[in-house]
Amino acid sequence: MASFWSGTVADFLRTPMSEITGSLAMAQIRHFRVSAAQQLHAWEVTISMLRPALAAIPQAETWHILLEYPMLRLGKRPDVILLTHSAILVLEIKARSSMHTAADRRQVEDYAIDLYDFHAGSRAHPIIPILVAENAVDAVPDMPLILNMGVMSPLDTSANALPALLIEVTRHTDTVAGKLDADAWLRAPYRPVPTIIDAACMLYAKHNVAEIRAARSDSYNLNLTTTAILQEIAWARTAGQRIILFVTGIPGAGKTLCGLNTIFGVEDAGRGTYLTGNPTLIHVLREALTRDAVDLGAQRSDARRKMLSVIQALPKFRDHYVSHPAEAPPESVVVVDEAQRCWSANWAIGKTRDKAVPLTRSEPAYLLEIMARRSGFCAMVCLVGSGQEIHAGEGGLAEWGNALRDAALHGIEWHVRAAPDLLKVADLRQRLGALDNLQSLPPLHLNVAIRHIRSTLAAFGVDRVLEGDASGASELARGMGELPFWLTRDLMATRKWLRGHARGLRRAGLLASSGAARLRSEGLGAELPHMDASSVAHWFLDRFPDDVRASDALEVVATEFSCQGLELDYVGLCWDADFIREPGRREWRVRTFRGTKWQVPQQAEVIANQVNTYRVLLTRARYDTVVFVPNGDEDDGTRNPVIYNDIVAFLRACGARDLDDSYLDRCPESNEGLGGILAQSVLELPT
């Protein structure tokens, strides 16, 4: 993606300021559809500050300078990127400021890490984030050890001290680093992988939708699926027909992104809403979208009210229209998140018998009937997660098939498009069955994981682990180079590792199964209340140390109910004795804690849900997962050390690596060893 203004430093020094700011303003309007008036002063300060600083360095004339380089984080761009002869300098300039805040340091460091992770031309050179507070005390900071590649810790400076700092940085980098070809850097691909939250904000504001779709070369599958959905919806709209599409995918393949793009990202998609029964996803997306709208000038109360219709709780949507049978929804396009989790008829009847709105049919039957109240065109896009069922009473795709057949018997016709695997899957709960007007569309299956930054195969490694296939997981690990999983028996080591790696705005957090009852003995009894909107928003969106309620405080543990559908950059997975290995048995043993002892459930649904719980937990990380397994206690029958040791032995056999002391010594935020740490997070980007 091109910066708002780019040229050599010589060009920068001789181009009139008005011409540069005019180019910046036009780019601001073109990219973000908002006026740049409030930015003009900041740009003028930046230009006025940089010109004398760069003019004082004779060799700087042949450097390259980029102003306002979009980083696929809505409205957030580093002010300046300087390409010297040997290094990449990322400058964030705070006009009129006299303070270097922790938040500002995280911001500029995050920009630098984004370049390292996602820009192919930035991997072989030092990247140095510099925070310039215009009116700060004039001092050149002590120069840390600068390596020949990797992201250095942020340097603080002022406007007056900037020239001296640039000279000192250049002296060091020219000594240790190779030559940087600015033209090659400008041609190199920048392929970021936005988080779900970033993508939602961008799609809702209709910014950079094309860049999101093309973010990775391995997102071809995602692009095919998105295109297929939009083409089928366009056909149904033109024909005035009802259509329902079933989109399947492995964990982290982009189902949520497809759904959000259907609702937010297309000009002619019609009025739509995203329905989910996942309260955490509702809380986090609504709050993130609200905060973003406020940052762009909206009133918070207005933004919050608007988000109520954009992201809706499926149970409230359902109950409203069940209790108002003559009312049709205004939305012509509805995305149903995790459609396989909709309630079966028996479960719906039992769960709502004493509620204000008692149900007599399955949730799929109600949703189809509600949308069919609209005359003419309507579309439903059902997102189906493979191995994501973690609740009792989830009816699977068979309930949707039954509801569609029943609708046809009552004269309500739906055109059905489904991924091929839903027609032949072995699990009868997840098979649609025979339907009129059914077409199999291969693009509706997402089989390439894009959540994980380093490998598209991480989800398949998790599958082998949960199948009890240590040799298969180990073979896959060798093919990947290594699995993105680490092992430790030390909770403090887990926290140290997470804090050392979650630099910039990368987010870390502790996860555990809701059945991990004996982790309390390790001090992990504080569990994130997933139904509490405020607690969930603080955990996923705020930052430690500014807010101790944030995930990266590493104090409160999120369960599968809190994190399903969302993600973290780095995960500390706390593994308890609710999911264990037994000698001579390939399958995992599922246990539940009752009273004072562990019990072994026999119900197939309970067992399957617990396997899926660990699938959810093992696939939340965008980078790496550290698995903490307690040592246990010989004097406590509920924490048998042998059981925990067997878990560790199996995970080690699968390819998980031990978090040894030598590696932990490199975790603090000094530059010592950062090159080695960051080298392990290399994303092989195509050239």
Where are these regions (language model features)?
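Conserved lysine of the Walker
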Residues: 255
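Signature of the SF2 helicase/ATPase Hel1-core->accessory helical subdomain module
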Residues: 336-431
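C-terminal accessory regions
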Residues: 379, 553-664
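Accessory nucleic-acid engagement/destabilization modules that flank
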Residues: 1-192
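N-terminal pre-P-loop "Q-motif" helix
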Residues: 196, 204, 211-243
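Conserved RecA-like ASCE ATPase "motif II neighborhood" in helicase/translocase motors
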Residues: 302-371, 555-559
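Conserved helicase/translocase motor-coupling segment
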Residues: 259, 391-394, 422-567, 571-577
